[in-house]
């Protein structure tokens, strides 16, 4: 029997458990997505100086709670970045980008000393990409050319119709990639002309995962 009646209750529990891993005061990097939205509601407890947001949607939520949002260009670094994931494995490698904010998420994560990932256990996987497609942000004029390159890598790219990123680009969701070496594939796809970035977070892996399971909260690190 689960401690939680719904998946949303799991997400709320993971968000609450993450607070102790986040510094009070200072400037926090904040991700995007349904689990992070639960965390944002709790952030006033940390009495933050400000936050760096990974999307316009997150910035709006933070401002509604009275938390100042600052431009990353005015920040030298962050003590922590907190975000969810579409998938995460035992190496703390992730697939992100279901909400199309992957590029800004990766940028903000890159200047943080610590990446705290908050998920429910449905996001914990043995191998990335088997159940969730890999999002790739692409400059619009390069969409077809990039898609052909992704096919040559063994993927089946699908254009995410009607979605334009905060950066004015489009998303290709790539199915059926065999992601055995996440670090290598992240670099390979990023080297394709026209790709802004892809949703593999291996170079910017999580430092710790706060995982809500049926039996409660588990804190996991890379093995």
Curated annotation (Swiss-Prot):
Sorted alphabetically, the Gene Ontology BP terms of this entry are:
D-ribose metabolic process; pentose-phosphate shunt, non-oxidative branch
Q: Name the catalytic site residues.
A: 105 (proton acceptor)
Q: One GO CC term of this entry?
A: cytosol
Task: Please name the Gene3D superfamilies in this protein's record.
Answer: 3.30.70.260, 3.40.50.1360
- State any single GO MF term: ribose-5-phosphate isomerase activity
In which pathway does this enzyme or protein participate?
Answer: Carbohydrate degradation; pentose phosphate pathway; D-ribose 5-phosphate from D-ribulose 5-phosphate (non-oxidative stage): step 1/1
Q: Binding residues for substrate, per the UniProt record?
A: 32-35, 83-86, 96-99, 123
Q: Which UniProt keywords apply?
A: Isomerase
What Enzyme Commission number(s) apply to this enzyme?
A: 5.3.1.6
What CDD domains does this protein's entry cite? RPI_A
Catalytic reaction list: aldehydo-D-ribose 5-phosphate = D-ribulose 5-phosphate
Describe the function of this protein. Catalyzes the reversible conversion of ribose-5-phosphate to ribulose 5-phosphate.
Which protein family is it in? Belongs to the ribose 5-phosphate isomerase family.
- What is the name attached to this protein's record? Ribose-5-phosphate isomerase A
Q: Which organism is it from?
A: Acinetobacter baylyi (strain ATCC 33305 / BD413 / ADP1)
